[in-house]
């Protein structure tokens, strides 16, 4: 089973270019998905990546890469990964819904002025 990395292109603490390069070097065969991961709270203070749907975060990229390396050495449980994938998708869906409602509210507020 191929490894999968999810990394954010919007969070302040994530350096997309260097993190992507390091992950590609660690596992050239892995699938890398770039985009908002709806992990904004931790992403303001820590660099992070989702490794096979499991969130890993650290204060520095070096620390994160150590955690990623350890995670990749652990045996994988397909059922657990599926559960985590569903949880991540639900988190993203809720964030998109919140963003949509906020945009509607702002639009309505501007129309009232």
UniProtKB/Swiss-Prot annotation:
Record Pfam families: DUF1450
Family membership noted in the UniProt record: Belongs to the UPF0741 family.
Region of interest (Disordered), residue spans: 68-113
The name this protein goes by in its record: UPF0741 protein SERP0241
InterPro entries: DUF1450, UPF0741
HAMAP family from the UniProt entry: UPF0741 (MF_01863)
Record field: compositional bias (Basic and acidic residues): 68-102
Coiled coil stretches, renumbered: 78-113
Composition bias type Basic residues, residue spans: 103-113
């Amino acid at each position: 089973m191929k490894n999968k990395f999810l990394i954010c292109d919007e969070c302040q603490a994530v350096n997309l270019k260097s993190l992507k390069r390091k992950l590609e070097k660690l596992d050239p065969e892995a699938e890398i998905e770039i985009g908002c991961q709806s992990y904004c709270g931790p992403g303001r203070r820590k660099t992070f990546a989702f490794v096979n749907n499991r969130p890993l975060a650290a204060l520095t990229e070096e620390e994160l890469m150590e955690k990623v390396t350890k995670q990749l050495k652990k045996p994988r449980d397909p059922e657990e990964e599926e559960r985590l994938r569903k949880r991540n998708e639900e988190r993203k869906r809720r964030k998109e819904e919140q963003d949509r409602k906020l945009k509607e509210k702002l639009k309505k507020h501007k129309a009232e002025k």
